[in-house]
Amino acid sequence: MLQHEVIMVASECRGLAKVGGLGDVVWDLGQQLARDGVNVAIILPRYGIIEAQDEAAATFNVPFAGRKFSTTLTHVDVHNGPSLYFIKQKLFFEGEDSTVYVNSATRGRGPFEDDARRFAFFS
């Protein structure tokens, strides 16, 4: 029988980085699919706020906005659940951008300007 595989790419996931209902849906759906025998992987940005023992799986350059950004794919072992992967890039997801969503207005920029840049890179 064919093994189904699902990759879920999201900005939030309960237990790691959650602000609203999206984080609940991503985790609960991933857990249920895994229980149903589906091979599930969840991919998130590696925000600085995430406390996980992840290991580097690959490093590569991502072309974005006319530049190349060194980026690392990391992995966390989860027993009996979805595989967890993170896209780690310091400029977009660490330091002052280490939370899920950023209030750009406090930086004198337009609403959601920083999030638009961060998630365009992530996509």
Q: What name fits each language-model region?
A:
Residues 1-80:
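N-terminal subdomain of nucleotide-sugar transferases
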Residues 46-123:
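A conserved catalytic-core segment of Leloir-type glycosyltransferases
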